[in-house]
Structures are given as structure tokens and as C-alpha cells.
């Protein structure tokens, strides 16, 4: 929705595609077409039929490789190759491409059937190619790994899981922006998760309190090194990182904006509208939005969540008086769609700290 709204403000004609017209983005796009985003031949025909100038996704790892492949085939603008997008969409390929020489990489093991874990415990068990925090488990023993294995693998399109050494320390989200291989923007936020749901986001706090001057320098080096290894030279990057004794370890990385509206928080906090920057850079080659960068003002984004399958009930959520913006994904009485399948986002608010 955020991307479509930005393009509408820029005067672009917007086309949205999805399997169903059941999201807020579909309602505000100039045109909506019911197309499976994985159906590349149908999408290609649609793009050619309507003479569409660019195809892009700002928040979906599943859509990124498709958008990049179509852009390569049709000569449309794109930031990264389809290979790079595919590497970032497959955690096993990402770990392999980063190599052991990357200081931010984590010991890992890929499995397509139950095996003895070699990375030690505790460890993180997750699908090799899923998004939305689906099928992620913290396991403390071989027995726990085996009991959770099938549940994690069911979310993998390739039928594989990855087991990674558990990194003990605070978790941060990192939004960056590259221009011709230079890291021109970097902002870290504390990533506060729900204690009862491993990895599921509750709050983002800007600037990250877990990042001091020493950590910031290491963080920049790690992000830039990882981008070079996987082939990201231009456009947005998003990382989930954990700091263990001040050292940054990469949990996830992807060549897109995050899916948590952090562009909105960062515009209010640091002056740069990353969503606008993405499309001005992609469509027109302009990056002057970066000149608006200023010292970061403390802010937070807080998500409201409900169990999937429940009915939206706005009245149960408290909106602070000092909130500067808020949004609900559902109307009262609408059913919450399963995304992570455990505790799904139904809205958010942003406030100054």
C-alpha cells in the first residue's frame, strides 16, 4: 500500500496484481488485476499489453526475484539482478554466498531430512526460503529440533530447512541505501519482539539504543561487505542483525525496503523519505532525496496484533495521545488473514520518544 500511495502522489499510473483484492493497496491502485505474482508468463503478457514502464515490489521477498526476472527480460529498470534477488530469498544460498570470510555470517547447516545438528544448541530452525517469520523455532536440543522439523519444512517451497547457531544479544533492523556501490544511508532500529513468539516484531525504536559508536562502525562495514558479496550496488537494503558482544551477525538480508513501514518512521526521524527515494532513483535516476538527511530524532513504531482467523476489534487497542500517525489494516469485524500464522499485524502507530 505504501508504495502505491507514493507512486500516486508522484503522478504515476499504478497497477497492482495479487491473487485477491483483499488488501488496502488494491483499493488505492488505479488498476487492480487478479494475477498470481508467481505466474510470470501471465504477468509478462499483462505488462506488455498495458505498456507498463516498471515492475517492482517494496516489501515481498517472494515477489522480488519475479520482478527482477521480468525487468531483465523486458528491459525495464531494476536495481539488482534476478540472481541476487533469488540468493537473498533463499537463506541457504545467502549463507553460501556470504562465505566464511564474511564476519557477519553465522555457522549453519542445511537439511532436507532430519539429521544430527552440527552447529550446537541452542539454535534457530527455519525454512530455507520463506518470509513473514513463518516456521521459525528456537530449539534447545536434538529432540526439539526433530519435533519441530516437519512444522518448519512445510513453509519451504524447496522442502529444506536451515539450522543456524543462536546468536545471543539484542536484535536490530537496519535500513540502508546504496548508490553506485556506496552506502549513502544507514539507520538502525531496536527490534523488540513478542516474548512468546520467536522473531515476531512488536516495536521498532529509532535510533537503536543497542548501537554505540563502535557498533555503528562495525555495522556499516558488515552491511557494505555483505552487499558486495551478493551483488547489491544500488537501491535499498534491509537487514535483520543481532549483536553478540558488540559484533554484528546477519540474520536476514534483502535488496528491498522492510515490510514494517520503517520508511515512514525514518522520514519523520531522519528527514529522508526512502519510499520516494526508491522510485525517483528507479524511474528517473534521481537521488537528491538523500540531501534531506538530518540528525535522528527518537521515535518508535508499535504494532497491534491479533490471532489469525479472529475478527478485527479496534476497540481493544490503545492509541496513545502523543501518536503522530496510526493505521488499521482491517475494518471492525473483518477476519485477520494468516501471514505468520501465529500473531499477525492488524495496525500500527508511530510516536515521538
Predicted regions mapped to residue ranges:
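ATP-binding N-terminal substructure of ATP-dependent carboxylate-amine bond-forming enzymes
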Residues: 1-84, 288, 296, 334-335, ...
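Short, hydrophobic beta-strand segments that form beta-sheet elements in well-ordered domains
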Residues: 13-19, 55, 107-111, 123, ...
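A conserved helix-loop-beta module that forms one wall/lid of the active-site cleft
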Residues: 72-135, 140-142
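Conserved ATP-binding module of the ATP-grasp superfamily
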Residues: 104-106, 122-125, 136-173, 188-189, ...
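Peripheral (often C-terminal) accessory segments that flank ATP-dependent C-N-forming ligase machineries
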Residues: 117, 277-353
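Protein kinase-like catalytic core scaffold
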Residues: 123, 184, 249-252
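ATP-dependent carboxylate/phosphate-activation module, predominantly the ATP-grasp catalytic core
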Residues: 165-232, 236, 243, 254-282
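Flexible, glycine/charged-enriched surface loops at secondary-structure junctions
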Residues: 233-239, 289-294
